[in-house]
Swiss-Prot record:
Principal place of residence: cytoplasm
GO terms assigned for molecular function: spermidine synthase activity
Pfam family, one: Spermine_synth
Active site: 155 (proton acceptor)
Family of this protein: Belongs to the spermidine/spermine synthase family.
Record's protein name: Polyamine aminopropyltransferase
GO cellular component terms, A-Z: cytosol
Reactions catalysed, as given in the entry: S-adenosyl 3-(methylsulfanyl)propylamine + putrescine = S-methyl-5'-thioadenosine + spermidine + H(+)
Amino acid sequence: MELWYTEKQTEHFGITAKIKRTLHTEKTDFQQLDVIETEEFGNMLVLDGMVMTTEKDEFVYHEMVAHVPLFTHPNPKHVLVVGGGDGGVIREVLKHPSVEKATLVEIDGKVIEYSKKYLPSIATALNDPRVDVQVDDGFLHIAKAESAYDVIMVDSTEPVGPAVKLFEKGFYQGIAKALKEDGIFVAQTDNPWFHGELIRKVYADVQEIFPITRLYTANIPTYPSGLWTFTIGSKTYDPLHVEPSRFYDIETKYFTKDLHKAAFALPRFVDDLIK
């Protein structure tokens, strides 16, 4: 008998993967958590029925969340990751030699626990001495912080359940306060095919708070539609105008210095969302 997992991405569309077995399933205090072993994409983390990451394509998302802001900022020392309990963004953050401390604030400790167990290649950096892992509410953490971080990365789930408030204007205002005077933040902002209005709203909210606001994209096969967006807000530095000398060699599979700029070249229908 064949086993297949389907993520219903809209009322009329979804993606399906053939699975070998279910590795773990649990209703945590915050969400339904499943880890499944798939034929095509390796181990897959699923939260509330939505694919969060897979062993095969995880590097695209994690590299694009981390390296775009970290190459934009000339000297990022203190970095905060909100969400991201799988550890992939933290792994990429630590590739930058200027980073002295990376704080991870994940609301659901079970995500951290089972990522370490079933996604070790992604969670590999969570025990690094430069990393401060806190099982806490990222929204509350931001509210208490002031001029504390050079770069903040919001690696949230979709805007449902505990992540809803991470897409609100008040949260972005809190981020601006938590950043240093030349700080940068980035957030994943879903896909333009099914959630164009969300992108439009988030971009407008961020633009009211940060003098430099940009949208960029990446191609992630297991995410809805495959085309994913990220919104970056900066107090000082423009990600479109990074001096070539600021780029240095790090080990990546997707990100390059040329792709850094190219990612901001938007399809017209996406660009129209933010005009």
